[in-house]
């Protein structure tokens, strides 16, 4: 049998042309140190800052310290099975989280994995956890109100869509309750809410989730949780994961409310990571970039321009103070970043004034532009009235005789304090807030005993719902007050048939 050299040559050439190389080139390194959620690895010379790295046990890490001879890595998950000498490889991808509507109604960890036992989440999109905030020309000024349903906030420290309003106070002063009530009040307001629980007890998070479910608020809410028992890298990354999920909706032209509960615990987790990564400590052992930790997070909340869809992210970050000290390091940092703060005072809370908002120390830098006309008219003098009442109340401790004008101010002040009280998880629509504040500022409550104020308020709402619902409708649709005569007549008619004098 003759061998045809040309055929063999053609066959070999064809095989060479059709050859598909089947191999992967990955840059790998070796773990040189492991402990406390931190790893160090040699050999990853081209790793990027914030890059996702994969360990041989399947766990993922994030490159943080890029040094001349090794890389400092924070481990996002189980690290007890990682050993020195294990292989760690680059993925070539920056840390991302799943985003999209499929997350709504679910409880997830900072990596976007479900922790509520309701099965997998069919998300299709991803966004990087670290992203550049919208620039100056990509933003619009805050002009639309975000109604929290709490009279003390909507009247005294109004919040607008796209604003960052800090909620600050000692532990157990009702910070979480304020945020949960604000989420409950977004029902039917075309708003998506994200509640980020950082370093909370798992039982506490479960309670908040059940509250949201009971009031039907979980239908438009995503809960991101990094509990106290989880490694500090997850606590550090949780707020960034939450805001990445929010940005997806914002750039689709939707409105988002995001609650960070609380950033003090994130700062402590970041301090822990930084010290373990051997970064130089600064004041109170926090690293030098702890301001940037929070500023780059909160700057991502904005009201974006119409060219970008006109969506918004409104942020309610929490800071926990020690003994009411709002001049502490992290507290002053976040106060300077945000557009105002709501200060909750322990003494007010313990004396039964809830929400325990200190009107003197609380401020909204957006102010009246985030209020409807009707609220602006009825709440205009409320803050001054409250401040002068507090001042006069301090003087009356000395028991001096009071003239009629001073007595009238004190009486009005006591009724103002009562009106601003509100039961837990009972947010009020803005039209009801406007009517009761109108009744207060126009003297209709001056002859009602202080102990009967809350009963008077409930009865007034019921009476208006039955007989004057068109006045509520007018406020809701026009955002302005109805004719003063109509309101006066309606309140007088209620007082004539009710026995509160």
UniProtKB/Swiss-Prot annotation:
One function term, GO molecular function aspect: proton-transporting ATP synthase activity, rotational mechanism
Annotated membrane topology: Peripheral membrane protein
InterPro entries linked to this entry: ATP_synth_asu-like_sf, ATP_synth_asu_C, ATP_synth_asu_C_sf, ATP_synth_F1_a_nt-bd_dom, ATP_synth_F1_asu, ATPase_F1/V1/A1_a/bsu_N, ATPase_F1/V1/A1_a/bsu_N_sf, ATPase_F1/V1/A1_a/bsu_nucl-bd
GO cellular component labels: plasma membrane; proton-transporting ATP synthase complex
Entry's localization field: Cell membrane
Pfam families registered for this protein in UniProt: ATP-synt_ab, ATP-synt_ab_C, ATP-synt_ab_N
Enzyme Commission number(s): 7.1.2.2
Binding locations of ATP: 169-176
Site (Required for activity): 362
Keywords, alphabetical: ATP synthesis, ATP-binding, Cell membrane, CF(1), Hydrogen ion transport, Ion transport, Membrane, Nucleotide-binding, Translocase, Transport
Primary location: membrane
Top class in the EC scheme: translocase
Recorded catalytic activity of this chain's protein: ATP + H2O + 4 H(+)(in) = ADP + phosphate + 5 H(+)(out)
Coiled coil: none
PANTHER family to which the protein is assigned, alphabetical: ATP SYNTHASE SUBUNIT ALPHA, MITOCHONDRIAL
Family label: Belongs to the ATPase alpha/beta chains family.
Assembly information from the UniProt record: F-type ATPases have 2 components, CF(1) - the catalytic core - and CF(0) - the membrane proton channel. CF(1) has five subunits: alpha(3), beta(3), gamma(1), delta(1), epsilon(1). CF(0) has three main subunits: a(1), b(2) and c(9-12). The alpha and beta chains form an alternating ring which encloses part of the gamma chain. CF(1) is attached to CF(0) by a central stalk formed by the gamma and epsilon chains, while a peripheral stalk is formed by the delta and b chains.
Its biological purpose: Produces ATP from ADP in the presence of a proton gradient across the membrane. The alpha chain is a regulatory subunit.
Protein name: ATP synthase subunit alpha
Lineage: Bacteria, Bacillati, Bacillota, Bacilli, Lactobacillales
């Amino acid at each position: 049998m003759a061998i045809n050299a040309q055929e063999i040559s053609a066959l070999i050439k064809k095989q060479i042309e059709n050859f598909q190389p089947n191999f992967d080139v990955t840059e790998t390194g070796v773990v040189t140190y492991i402990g406390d959620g931190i790893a160090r690895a040699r050999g990853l010379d081209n790793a990027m800052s914030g890059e996702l790295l994969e360990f041989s046990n399947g766990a993922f890490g994030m490159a943080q310290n890029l040094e001349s001879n090794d890389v400092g890595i924070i481990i996002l998950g189980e690290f007890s099975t990682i050993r020195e000498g294990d292989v760690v490889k680059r993925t070539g991808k920056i840390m991302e989280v799943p985003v999209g509507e499929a997350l709504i109604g679910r409880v997830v960890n900072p990596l976007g994995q479900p922790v509520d036992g309701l099965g997998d989440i069919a998300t299709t999109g991803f966004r990087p956890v670290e992203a550049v905030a919208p620039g100056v020309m990509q933003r619009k000024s805050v002009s639309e109100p975000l109604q929290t349903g709490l009279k003390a906030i909507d009247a005294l420290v109004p919040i607008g869509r796209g604003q960052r309003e800090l909620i600050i106070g000692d532990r157990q002063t009702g910070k979480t309750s304020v945020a949960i009530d604000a989420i409950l009040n977004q029902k039917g307001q075309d708003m998506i809410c994200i509640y980020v629980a950082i370093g909370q007890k798992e039982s506490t998070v479960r309670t908040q989730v059940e509250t949201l479910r009971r009031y039907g608020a979980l239908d438009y809410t995503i809960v991101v949780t990094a509990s106290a028992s989880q490694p500090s890298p997850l606590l550090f990354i949780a707020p960034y994961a939450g805001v990445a999920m929010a940005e997806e909706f914002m750039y689709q032209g939707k409105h988002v409310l995001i609650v960070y509960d609380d950033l003090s615990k994130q700062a402590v987790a970041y301090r822990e990571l930084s010290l373990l990564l051997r970064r130089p400590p600064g004041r109170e052992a926090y690293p030098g970039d702890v301001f940037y930790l929070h500023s780059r997070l909160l700057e991502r909340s904005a009201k974006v321009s119409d060219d970008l869809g006109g969506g918004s992210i409104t942020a309610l970050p929490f800071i926990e103070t020690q003994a009411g000290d709002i001049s502490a390091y992290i507290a002053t940092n976040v106060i300077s970043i945000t557009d105002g703060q709501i200060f909750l005072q322990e003494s007010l809370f313990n004396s039964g004034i809830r929400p325990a908002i200190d009107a003197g120390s609380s401020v909204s830098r957006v102010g009246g532009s985030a209020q409807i006309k009707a609220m602006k008219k009825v709440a205009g003098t409320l803050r001054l009235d409250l401040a002068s009442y507090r001042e006069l109340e301090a003087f009356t401790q000395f028991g001096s005789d009071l003239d009629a004008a001073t007595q009238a101010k004190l009486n009005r002040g006591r009724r103002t304090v009562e009106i601003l009280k509100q039961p837990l998880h009972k947010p009020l629509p803005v039209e009801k807030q406007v009517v009761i504040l109108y009744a207060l500022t126009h003297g209709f409550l001056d002859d009602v005993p202080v102990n009967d104020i809350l009963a008077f308020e409930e009865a007034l709402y019921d009476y208006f719902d039955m007989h004057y619902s068109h006045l509520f409708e007018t406020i809701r649709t026009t955002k302005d007050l109805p004719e003063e005569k109509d309101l006066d007549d309606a309140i007088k008619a209620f007082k004539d048939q009710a026995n509160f004098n």
